[in-house]
């Protein structure tokens, strides 16, 4: 009998966290929740703690921690509440933990994810920003600690499944010619360009295929999400940006493909449900039931493909430029995007201005080497300052 694995879920109240807990609950003989973390949805975090009875919960502030601790005691639970980034790093690196779901959105997830890496944990990486920001430093830490890094993004998990087991030897050595990264095209794939000036946050968050959080939904609408995934794919699979091609596939059934030098193209298909890649990574190299319905090809009937329109999706072009520039450029791209998307969700800017802000930040700030984590955070901070200056200068 295999020992029950202890799982920390960073970002438990988000869509990835909830899907992870759904899969875990289906396999109580295999997995137990060690820690859950939340940011603003404290009532939801309390409910999850009552259901899963973790040893630890983490919230950002002491006042929230005190309230949650009192509520947990009232519910008869022994769950201990920790606070802030230090608490996140503690539950990510605790000796008892076997695997960490890294699902905190944005730059805030970098330090706790790195703490899990440095502790040699099995990392289920949903926080693409951590790898986008720190790139080489992150992968060096993985290599040094012996941590197992498994991608959760449906596209990267699909690529992982289509790659040979020894892909780390180098793509050319294992016969891989290119990676084909699929994208749905989001809710604005066919919206007339002149109407994009007037789209609302609600429209941007109404993804046709996937159920996601607000920030990643906007990123999907702008295809910045695909740009970040392009950068992530380069690091995960040691690929050059020129080896990663983005293909718009509206049905979101083929999650990505790998093109081999002999003419073979391997693809991974499935219903658009994040429980599939989560279950794949949780159980790897085994397979477990995810709760996802079988794929009905007859109901789908057709699969369409087209090239992305860079006039419609300038964020994708900016992300590829950052990938090619390397060094501090991806961290600046990510930071500027986080500020811009937040401003759009707050109705302070129009949708096309997301790309305008990012473009200005990348144009104004020179690319510098990032040989240590402090340099990554310095680039992140500088980009945020420049993005805020754009907002102030334009009266937003």
UniProtKB/Swiss-Prot annotation:
One Pfam short name: DXP_reductoisom
Pathway this chain belongs to: Isoprenoid biosynthesis; isopentenyl diphosphate biosynthesis via DXP pathway; isopentenyl diphosphate from 1-deoxy-D-xylulose 5-phosphate: step 1/6
Residues binding NADPH: 13-16, 127, 129, 213
Cofactor list: Mg(2+); Mn(2+)
Keyword NAD: no
UniProt keyword terms in alphabetical order: Isoprene biosynthesis, Manganese, Metal-binding, NADP, Oxidoreductase
SUPFAM superfamilies linked: 1-deoxy-D-xylulose-5-phosphate reductoisomerase, C-terminal domain, Glyceraldehyde-3-phosphate dehydrogenase-like, C-terminal domain, NAD(P)-binding Rossmann-fold domains
Broad class of enzyme this protein falls into: oxidoreductase
Disulphide linkage map: none
BP GO annotations: isopentenyl diphosphate biosynthetic process, methylerythritol 4-phosphate pathway involved in terpenoid biosynthetic process
Function statement: Catalyzes the NADPH-dependent rearrangement and reduction of 1-deoxy-D-xylulose-5-phosphate (DXP) to 2-C-methyl-D-erythritol 4-phosphate (MEP).
Similarity field: Belongs to the DXR family.
PANTHER family: 1-DEOXY-D-XYLULOSE 5-PHOSPHATE REDUCTOISOMERASE, 1-DEOXY-D-XYLULOSE 5-PHOSPHATE REDUCTOISOMERASE, CHLOROPLASTIC
Protein name (Swiss-Prot/TrEMBL): 1-deoxy-D-xylulose 5-phosphate reductoisomerase
